[in-house]
Amino acid sequence: VSGGVNVMTAQYIGAKKDKDVREVVHSAAWMCALMGVILLLFGQVFSKLILEVMKTKEELIDGAALYLRIYFLGMPALGIYNFGNAVFSAVGDTKKPVYILAFSGVVNILLNLFFVIVCRLSVAGVAIASVTSQYMSAVLIMIALMKADERIRFSPKYLKLYPDKAKDLFKLGFPAGIQNAIFQFANLFVQVGVNSFDAVIVEGNSAATNADALVYDVMAAFY
């Protein structure tokens, strides 16, 4: 959905159709939050089943399921942040979302240290830190949108689903979502193979995957 937000917002701003911009922004906010709630519920119900299908080691599965269930609580916040990021990017403001994400990332690191070292919450502590930082980024980007240029400014009084705009957002965003889903689905097969090894190797692969994601995100900034 966020991909559609970026395209449609930029198009309507270029055409000087402020009413359409407002309808796109507020429809997208509603849709992204709803998608996040759906993913949250999906994660609570199917986290352990997914891990079992992926042949996760018995000694890791309880901790991994706990982590996933807590992490999925942050899906609505992730959806809202991605929505805000797309709106700001549509008007050429790519700095504000980065500053917000960087601040939330620092908070995430500090909370990781606090929950894991001080509170000794282990896996749960890492997940709680991630979710907390995600909601912080969502709140900050919504505050920024409520103070943004009038064309893209978020206002609760306009928050509703405009059917025509929602349909177009879905049509534009769905192909990009499928593309990303196919890539992630392929990675599941790789993970199933990795899970057949010892727990130490699985943990090492997780660390390598995080490093790979960092490199990919840096490259993606230039696309």
Please provide the spans of the model-predicted regions.
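Small-residue-rich hydrophobic transmembrane alpha-helices
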Residues: 1-40, 78-97, 191, 205-223
